[in-house]
């Protein structure tokens, strides 16, 4: 195969999880504080849901079943006024491990600062892939340091 027909990539993608990777806990904590929902009870209920649904013949993902529980709280009025704008605001309350934003920036600059990488136009990009809420991540301090966010969307008017 001729050299010029080979498809060459020059982008290094760093894929980051969010909860307990970039932040010490779960991103939903600011929601629980804002709406006076007991966080421990919420997660205990969520952890019981796969078995409850399983008894009904429905298999659910342990990672995303919490979203159904959040929707139940919205429908029951416990999360009255929860919107994407509010999620973005609450995302601003998320506290990251110390130095995360600086680490993202330093990693991005590394290939640009090395001649052997610069000559090939090697770039480093940051992406967040999470089962968390995208709007909260977009409202957080890390958002300006990432290239894209792939997470769960809160649909206000389905």
Map each language-model feature to its residues.
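Alpha-helical substrate-recognition element adjacent to the catalytic core
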Residues: 1-157
């Amino acid at each position: 195969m001729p050299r010029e027909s080979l498809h060459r990539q020059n982008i290094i993608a760093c894929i980051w999880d969010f909860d307990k990777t970039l932040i010490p806990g779960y991103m939903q904590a600011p929601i629980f504080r804002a709406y006076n929902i007991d966080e421990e009870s919420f997660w205990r209920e969520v952890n019981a849901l796969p078995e409850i649904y399983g008894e009904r013949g429905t298999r659910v993902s342990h990672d995303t079943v919490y979203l159904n529980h959040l929707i139940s709280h919205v429908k029951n009025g416990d999360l009255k006024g929860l919107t994407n704008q509010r999620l973005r605001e609450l995302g601003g309350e998320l506290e990251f491990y110390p130095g995360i934003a600086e680490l993202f920036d330093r990693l991005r600059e590394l290939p640009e600062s090395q001649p052997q990488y610069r000559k090939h136009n090697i770039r480093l990009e940051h992406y967040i892939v999470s089962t968390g809420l995208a709007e909260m991540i977009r409202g957080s301090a890390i958002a300006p340091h990432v290239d894209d966010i792939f997470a769960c969307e809160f649909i206000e008017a389905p």
